[in-house]
Curated annotation (Swiss-Prot):
Statement: the UniProt record of this protein carries the keyword Phosphoprotein: yes
Gene: Ccdc22
GO molecular function per UniProt: cullin family protein binding
Quaternary structure (record): Component of the commander complex consisting of the CCC subcomplex and the retriever subcomplex. Component of the CCC (COMMD/CCDC22/CCDC93) subcomplex consisting of COMMD1, COMMD2, COMMD3, COMMD4, COMMD5, COMMD6, COMMD7, COMMD8, COMMD9, COMMD10, CCDC22 and CCDC93. Forms a coiled-coil heterodimer with CCDC22; this heterodimer interacts with the guanine nucleotide exchange factor DENND10; the interaction is direct. Interacts with CUL1, CUL2, CUL3, SKP1, BTRC. Interacts with SNX17 and SNX31. Interacts with CPNE1 and CPNE4.
Annotated organism of origin: Rattus norvegicus (Rat)
Residues with PTM Phosphoserine: S410
GO biological process, one term: Golgi to plasma membrane transport
Span list, region Sufficicient and required for interaction with CCDC93: 1-447
Name under which the protein is recorded: Coiled-coil domain-containing protein 22
Subcellular location as annotated: Endosome; Cytoplasm, Cytoskeleton, Microtubule organizing center, Centrosome
Residue ranges the record marks as coiled coil: 321-384, 448-535
One Pfam assignment: CCDC22_CC
Keyword Mitochondrion in annotation: no
């Protein structure tokens, strides 16, 4: 079935259905893909019927049911022999879907000459898919940009247009000398992007501000017009709101006419840098560009030219010192400072040497102090011991007895501690031996696992080499495949169909052979059953004659009757077992068939659609109540 599904999917792709590459069987078909495949086939078979059907599954449940019923009616009109309804499209099962798609694929128009000449490679399929996509996009009606839904936006490839919303920008202006007055407004003036928080309005605001600057540049010779244009967007105007736009339009046209000359005059190619220099020459002539620090320094410390001239005039010329005397005094002062620096450096070196020597002496003294403290502690301990001994000398006998008692108690205490140690030592030693044994077992297990890991590494290396070899073979086969002709002719499909027919013929022969063997076995069973019945009848008659005269023969007759009954039960049990096994196989086939129909998934889809339909009905009822 997989081979037949692949051939059927290939036919659907040729009909224009966008089947994903990962879909290889009909079991993986979704509801959307089933609807698209059926609509594409109907459009190819009967364009009049298929053109009125959408290949996209609508989101509303009522629209889905109407589309499914329309598809079912169209297929029935084509002569589909089986029963067909909306459930075959919304909740498809694999056998019914295969029958329907085979019915539609058989009715697809075929042209032998066209199929023979047309290539069937991946590139040709890709080009046909592109053509079908372009045809679908051209078949869609044009919708104005403001009325397009997001889905139509994706299909028609256009973006939503935004309205022109601008805001007033406050930027540093030019003074009479052409310098930006940033030092006056820098603490309070925000950058242009921060003045317009909306991202969509930044470009519009900058364009409007630049247009105002352009008008100011054009009307620089007319102060009245300049002020009017400058404050047009800042103050409320009482005139017609279209008047500023018309005036701006006329000014731009006049500026372009003056810049580029009359229409009949030859146009002169100008560089962009020259145009910018020409536009800003009037404002920036003779004024060097400085940083904010230089501007603030000029504003803070530089005096006006008139004040500076007055101060310079008040200073007498005779009070200025000669330049040579000033240089000599500076050199003498520099020499004296150098001498002072040298003496200070010498003093610093001497102090550093003294500090090093004192540090070494300090370390030595600290070491001697520690040693003396240790010796004093030892002497104090010896002194305490001797003082205790001297205190015990007046009552020597009693103290000696007490000392012996203390020694004996110490010995008893040592014995008691030794016994306690033995009590603790024995379980600890046993635990140690147990842990040692566990450690040895773990070491053995670790060594065994290490050997297994080494063997695994070797097998991994062998597998890597095998994979590398297979990769080389794969590359070689791919290169050979690339050298083969790309176009797949009808001969390959014919050869494959003949192979399938041959396999079917072999299966039919095997089935016929199995049936004949079954018939022979049935005949043999019947003959053996008849022979068994006749044998039992003859034996029963012979034994029954002698059973009246002899007790042993009577017992044999009873055993014969019991054997016959048991054999009959055994044969009946075997027949019942065969019947049950046959029924089990039939039930397994039915289970596989039901599993192929995807009953559980279809039930889940039906429940989801039922909930969606109830929500739609509730929404419609709410709208009706509102109306």
């Amino acid at each position: 079935m997989e081979e037949a599904d692949r051939i059927l999917i290939h036919s659907l792709r040729q009909a224009g259905t966008a089947v994903p590459p990962e879909v290889q069987t009909l079991r993986a078909f979704t509801t959307e893909l089933v609807v698209e495949a059926v609509v594409r086939c109907l459009r190819v078979i009967n364009p009049d019927v298929g053109s009125g059907l959408s290949h996209l599954l609508p989101p509303a449940m009522s629209a889905r049911f109407r589309l499914a019923m329309s598809l079912a009616q169209a297929c029935m009109d084509l002569g589909y022999p089986l029963e067909l309804g909306y459930q075959n499209f919304l909740y498809p099962s694999e056998p019914d879907l295969r029958d329907l798609l085979l019915f539609l694929a058989e009715r697809l128009p075929t042209d032998a000459s066209e199929d023979a000449d047309q290539p069937a490679g991946d590139s040709a399929i890709f080009l046909r898919a592109i053509g079908s996509q372009i045809r679908d996009q051209l078949a869609l009606p044009w919708v104005p940009p403001l009325l397009r839904t997001p889905k139509v936006q994706r299909l028609q490839g256009s973006a939503l247009q935004q309205a022109f919303h601008s805001s007033r920008l406050v930027l540093p202006e030019l003074n009479c000398r052409g310098e930006p007055r940033e030092f006056q407004a820098s603490p309070l003036l925000l950058p242009a992007p921060s003045q317009v928080p909306q991202l969509l309005g930044r470009a519009a605001s900058l364009l409007e501000h630049h247009a105002i600057q352009l008008c100011q540049h054009v009307n620089r010779d007319c102060p009245g017009d300049e002020d009017r244009v400058r404050w047009a967007s800042r103050l409320p105007s009482q005139e017609d709101p279209r008047a500023p736009q018309q005036r701006l339009h006329k000014q731009l046209i006049e500026h372009l006419r003056q810049s580029w000359g009359p229409l009949g005059a030859p146009t002169q190619v100008r560089d962009l840098g020259e145009m910018l220099q020409a536009w800003g020459a009037k404002a920036m002539t003779g004024v060097p560009k400085g940083s904010r620090f230089t501007h603030s320094e000029k504003f803070t410390f530089h005096l006006e030219p008139q004040v500076q001239a007055a101060q310079v005039a008040d200073i007498p010329a005779a009070s200025q010192r000669p330049e040579q005397d000033t240089r000599a005094a500076q050199e003498e002062e520099l020499e004296s400072l150098r001498e002072q620096l040298a003496s200070v450096n010498h003093n610093i070196e001497e102090v550093e040497a003294n500090m090093k020597s004192l540090g070494m002496n300090l370390v030595q003294v600290e070491t001697e102090c520690r040693q003396s403290e240790l010796s004093v502690a030892e002497q104090e301990q010896a002194l305490r011991l001797k003082s205790r001994t001297v205190e015990l000398l007046p009552d020597g006998a009693a103290n000696l007895t007490k000392l012996q008692l203390v020694v004996e108690s110490s010995a008893q205490r040592l014995i008691h501690l030794a016994s306690q140690w033995e009590k603790h030592r024995v379980p600890l030693l046993a635990e140690y031996r147990h842990l040692r044994k566990l450690q040895d077992c773990r070491e053995l297990e670790s060594s065994r696992r290490l050997v297994e890991i080494q063997e695994l590494h070797q097998s991994v290396r062998a597998a890597a080499e095998e994979a590398r070899r297979k990769e080389e073979v794969y590359k070689q086969l791919v290169s050979e495949l690339e050298t083969l002709p790309k176009d797949v002719s009808r001969l390959a499909y014919t050869q494959r169909i003949l192979e399938i027919v041959g396999n079917i013929r072999k299966q039919k022969e095997e089935i016929t052979k199995i049936l004949s063997d079954t018939k022979e076995l049935q005949k043999e069973i019947n003959s053996l059953s008849g022979k068994l019945d006749r044998t039992f009848a003859v034996t029963d008659e012979l034994v029954f004659k002698d059973a009246k005269k002899d007790d042993a023969v009577r017992k044999a007759y009873k055993y014969l009757a019991a054997l016959h009954e048991n054999c009959s039960q055994l044969i009946q049990t075997i027949e019942d077992t065969g019947t049950i096994m046959r029924e089990v196989r039939d039930l397994e086939e039915q289970i596989e068939t039901e599993m192929g129909k995807k009953t559980l998934s279809n039930l889940e889809k039906i429940c989801e659609d039922y909930r969606a339909l109830r929500q739609e009905n509730a929404g419609l009822l709410g709208r009706v109540r509102e109306v």
